[in-house]
Amino acid sequence: MTTGDGKRREPAESLGRSSTGPSQQHLMSRLASVLTMEGQVLATVPAILSMTLWTIVLLSACSIAYWTYLVAFVARGYEYPEPEHDLADVQVRFLTVEAEHIVQESVNALPEAITDRHVIAEQPMEIGGATVHVVPEAFECAAIRKGRALEWARQNLTCEQEYLLFLDEDSIVTDLDGIPDADVVQFRERPRRSRSWLTYLAEVFRLGFQVEQRAFPSLTVPLYAWGGGIAIRAELEDRIGWDRKTMIEDTTFVWSVAADEGVDLDFTLARATFDTQAPPTIRAMIGQRGRWIAGSQAERGLLSRLYRTLTTVRNLAWAFSPAVPVLTVVPLFVPGTIAFELAFQVLSVAVFAFVIVWSVLGVRYYGESLSVGVALVVLTPIVSLLHSLGAFAGLVAPPTDFAVTRKVEPELVETADREVDGD
């Protein structure tokens, strides 16, 4: 088509297509690319979810398999050693900051045969029946907090006895009549309820898991130690010492003994059980668990490659164990998202079953009433979650300093009257 001036004019629809066509095509191309990319991302979500859930359940399964091996085979037939050393051969050292009334109750509970009694404190206090030593502010060493107090005592106190019995400020010695013959003697614990029922149930749950301690004397390296009730041959304590920065002094000491090529670790678990206080609040318990796992991870370098791997797997399984109850229901609500779904369901249910097993074993260890046992079993998902939250926090954001788990006044703690028998 031409105009009066002789110029050619394009049809209107042709002009419209030529002026907007390229931009429309570009827009459609970009939209198609975005949709394709979104589809690819969405397609990978089930794979990532499946891989994550399988990783968690396999970590838990490996940890449970090793625990089962320890309890069913290594600890099988273990007999608690009989005492061979009189209590007159023992020097007691209580570690505290400033909990005078709590320490006094613990000192009062000591057997009369133990006469060499010392309290290592951060603040001045008066304790009847024991000599109090205050760690000077000017004392410097690599160790911090409790470890610093232990190291000061090692350097400045004289011990003429065969054994040093280390106790926490709230450790109540209830049935001690002697010390078995070993370089390191681990006593068992029985936390008493203080303010919180949930933290108490979490302690019962934890002690159900810790029946594995019966296997520790057969291992090259005990997997952990409890410093609230541990007797160490004085000569060994003076040789190894406590001068190292750590948040788990007791476990680090035992691992250091095992790592010392000049020492053949002689470790045993005694029958005697000492009462302690369960953490008074959930927050205190979470902080406590966080220090345990962070300290364990930090000190793995003392272990051989095998035990380092075992410790890491167990710590990871503990930290991610809050997800275990969820694992059992994911396939039901989100079917088809997990590879090998039937195998996953079977394994996740088996893992959760062991969580119940630890609750039952804890009730048996404590000799608790039927009502408390039923309450713990019913509340096991919540209790195991609270028990592990601190481990998860300590693994993700390790604490950088040691914080003391505060104790409550003795009158707020359940009575310790009980009969102790073997488990």
How does the language model describe each region?
Residues 137-153, 157-161, 177-246, 286, ...:
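Long helical/loop segments within the catalytic core of UDP-sugar-dependent glycosyltransferases
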Residues 247-253:
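Acidic donor-binding loop at a coil-to-helix junction in glycosyltransferase catalytic cores
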Residues 108-141:
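Acidic donor-binding segment of Leloir-type glycosyltransferases
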Residues 255-274:
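Catalytic donor-sugar/metal-binding loop of nucleotide-sugar-dependent glycosyltransferases
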Residues 84-87, 97, 105-117:
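Short, acidic, metal-binding catalytic loop of nucleotide-sugar glycosyltransferases
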Residues 1-34, 57-90, 116-124, 305, ...:
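Juxtamembrane C-terminal module of membrane proteins
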Residues 33, 39-50, 323-345:
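Juxtamembrane "helix exit" motif at the C-terminal ends of alpha-helical transmembrane segments
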Residues 159-174:
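Short beta-strand-to-loop acidic/aromatic patch adjacent to the donor-nucleotide binding site
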